[in-house]
Amino acid sequence: SIQHTRPPHTLGLGLIIRYMEWDVALYRAALEQGMPPAKACLLIETINWQVFGPPIELGFKLSRLRSAKALVRARWLTDLMFAVMFTKPFARTVHPTSGAVAFDVTACPLANYFKSQGVPELTRHAACSLDHQMAAQWGLQLQRTQTIAQEHPLCDFRFVPPKTPQ
């Protein structure tokens, strides 16, 4: 008889993990061909933004139907992302505040995956850097002082409006 087992994560997170597997394969292939590690990491970062940037941009454009305010839209979008894509075993603690979209990620399966593959340095380029590009696309700045990828206990996300010149 066929036994059905439940996958360890949702379809959305499963898709992201599969894409990260492709990142590891491309990174290793680039290194095997003699590409310097820094250049291979930049290659992954560039390609990932080309893949993930357009749907993130579309989501932000559609969020205009909810509000004209960038922070309201960013809060709605990050909540949606954690409901659909960044599901368990991701763990997030939201910090209610009026001047920012603030939350901490306390468990990151992407950082764990890259570490388990022996390429923890790839996490920053394949995943973390996209957060800053996403914030810029939304007209916000991401203030982050620590990441799990850098061996901290959490990733602190603070999406804030850009500082305006005085």
Indicate residue ranges for each PLM-predicted region:
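Conserved SAM-binding loop
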Residues: 157
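N-terminal accessory segment detector
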Residues: 1-99, 109, 114-126, 141, ...
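Ligand-binding pocket scaffold of soluble enzyme catalytic domains
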Residues: 132
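Short, aliphatic-rich beta-strand segments
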Residues: 101-105
